[in-house]
């Protein structure tokens, strides 16, 4: 992982906190103070839960299995933002309706942190068929890359320390423990990916959630099938993709549980590839409260699937046990 980038971010956003009030006040749990943190998509909720622990109530807004790009929260969700002490969203134009509702209702003092925007410089944005540059929509899926997930975790740690300085030691300890888990995951990913033939490290997905991951783990994304309007590609575009699959020898075409599409079956059948439809973009595996129902569990599940479909051996990922820093009591809408 690119630890130098993480260190640079740490230095850039590190906050200096000054103890205030009595020792008793500083040691009081944030739960007692009634802190509420609102998040959007489930992977961000999970990362936040690992860093924040029991120092705040954490409430997700975007239901799992929903198209987070177009999801519009009910007006009743405004109350969540009114009561929020911190709001963490992905940003990068992912959850605009949710962001707009938050901005219209949150207290002026409540920070709304766009984690993706804080993690990337504009020059680092990735654009493709699903996320065209001329529409100003960069690919927002940073959380599928463990390196960026750690960046998100560090931003959350720093933000919460600023809001709740009495919890600084807890947030730091949780972050350190999360780094250990993610480092183990990264090692299992690297070992498993090393078993994939180099010629097979090619990704063609329906919804491109892996552009940043591919950059850091030695894969090449040759295309995404879903257009920017989240509709279906035209017959001409499908024909071009079939030719591309034949020319490159892509062994597998990856779909998404959130975006089922018969087009993928057609492309795979006509081009001779295998269609795999079990990847999850932001829908965590398992049920809330289960260990697999976590960002770590999501990464393990997706990359076992990807490794197997591309001709590799996912034994190291299968041996990796997903876990959270502590019990995850966050609210995940279903």
Sequence positions of predicted segments:
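Extracytoplasmic metal-acquisition and chelation regions
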Residues: 9-11, 19-334
């Amino acid at each position: 992982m690119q630890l130098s980038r993480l260190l640079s971010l740490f230095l850039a956003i590190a906050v200096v906190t000054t103890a205030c009030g009595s020792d008793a006040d500083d040691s009081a749990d944030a739960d007692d103070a009634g802190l509420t943190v609102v998040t959007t998509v489930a992977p961000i909720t999970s990362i936040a839960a690992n860093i924040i622990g029991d120092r705040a109530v954490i409430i997700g807004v975007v239901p799992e299995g929903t198209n987070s790009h177009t999801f519009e929260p009910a007006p009743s969700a405004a109350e969540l933002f009114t009561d929020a002490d911190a709001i963490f969203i992905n940003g990068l134009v992912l959850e605009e309706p949710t962001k707009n509702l938050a901005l219209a209702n949150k207290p002026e003092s409540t920070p709304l942190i766009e984690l993706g925007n804080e993690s990337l410089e504009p020059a680092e944005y990735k654009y493709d068929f699903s996320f065209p540059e001329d529409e100003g929509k960069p690919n927002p899926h940073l959380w599928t890359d463990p390196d960026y997930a750690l960046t998100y975790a560090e931003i959350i740690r720093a933000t919460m320390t600023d809001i709740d300085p009495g919890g600084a030691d807890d947030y730091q300890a949780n972050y350190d423990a999360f780094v250990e888990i993610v480092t183990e995951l990264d090692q299992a990913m690297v070992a498993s990916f090393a078993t994939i033939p180099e010629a097979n490290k090619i990704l063609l997905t329906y919804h491109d959630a892996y552009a940043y991951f591919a950059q850091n783990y030695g894969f090449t994304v040759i295309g995404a099938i879903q257009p920017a309007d989240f509709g279906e590609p035209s017959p001409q575009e499908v024909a071009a993709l079939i030719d591309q699959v034949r020319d490159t020898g892509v062994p597998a075409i990856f779909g998404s549980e959130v975006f089922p599409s018969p087009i993928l079956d057609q492309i795979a059948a006509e081009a001779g590839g295998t269609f795999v439809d079990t990847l999850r973009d932001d829908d965590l595996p398992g049920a809330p409260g289960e260990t697999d129902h976590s960002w770590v569990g999501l990464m393990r599940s997706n990359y076992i699937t990807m490794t197997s479909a591309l001709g590799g051996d996912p034994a190291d990922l299968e041996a990796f046990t997903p876990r959270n820093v502590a019990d995850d009591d966050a609210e995940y809408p279903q």
